[in-house]
């Protein structure tokens, strides 16, 4: 029984890590005007969950786009990745 519980715990921890989203947030010297992405989401988001997007500040050290979901989560994504480009194109139409 202990092995089953341990295996279940390991699976749940791995699932939590895999589903972890990188949320957008301000950081840096001028936190009021800049939103930067420290990291990008590691999994593909389906278009149906994204309602809006906005670009991160030009003062950020790396390019980023923040995808706003229908559940009002702000998720950082790499604008150079093909699936992100597709979402940006669809939402810009």
Swiss-Prot record:
Disulfide bonds join 36-60, 37-76. GO terms for molecular function: CCR chemokine receptor binding; chemokine activity. Keywords: Chemotaxis, Cytokine, Disulfide bond, Secreted, Signal. The N-terminal processed forms MDC(3-69), MDC(5-69) and MDC(7-69) are produced by proteolytic cleavage after secretion from monocyte derived dendrocytes. It comes from the Eukaryota. SUPFAM superfamilies: Interleukin 8-like chemokines. Pfam families: IL8. It is found in: Secreted. GO terms for biological process: antimicrobial humoral immune response mediated by antimicrobial peptide; cell-cell signaling; chemokine-mediated signaling pathway; chemotaxis; eosinophil chemotaxis; immune response; inflammatory response; positive regulation of cell migration. Highly expressed in macrophage and in monocyte-derived dendritic cells, and thymus. Also found in lymph node, appendix, activated monocytes, resting and activated macrophages. Lower expression in lung and spleen. Very weak expression in small intestine. In lymph node expressed in a mature subset of Langerhans' cells (CD1a+ and CD83+). Expressed in Langerhans' cell histiocytosis but not in dermatopathic lymphadenopathy. Expressed in atopic dermatitis, allergic contact dermatitis skin, and psoriasis, in both the epidermis and dermis. Residues 1-24 form the signal peptide. One of its GO terms (cellular component) is extracellular region. CDD domains: Chemokine_CC. Belongs to the intercrine beta (chemokine CC) family. May play a role in the trafficking of activated/effector T-lymphocytes to inflammatory sites and other aspects of activated T-lymphocyte physiology. Chemotactic for monocytes, dendritic cells and natural killer cells. Mild chemoattractant for primary activated T-lymphocytes and a potent chemoattractant for chronically activated T-lymphocytes but has no chemoattractant activity for neutrophils, eosinophils, and resting T-lymphocytes. Binds to CCR4. Processed forms MDC(3-69), MDC(5-69) and MDC(7-69) seem not be active. This is C-C motif chemokine 22. The gene is CCL22.
């Amino acid at each position: 029984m202990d092995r089953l519980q341990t295996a279940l715990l390991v699976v749940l921890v791995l699932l939590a890590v895999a589903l972890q989203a990188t949320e957008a947030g301000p950081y840096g010297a001028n936190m009021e005007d800049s939103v930067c992405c420290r990291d990008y989401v590691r999994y593909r988001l389906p278009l149906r969950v994204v309602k809006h997007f906005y670009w991160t500040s030009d003062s950020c050290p790396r390019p980023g786009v923040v995808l706003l979901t229908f559940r009002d989560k702000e998720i950082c994504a790499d604008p150079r990745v093909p699936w992100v480009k597709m979402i940006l194109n669809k939402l810009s139409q």
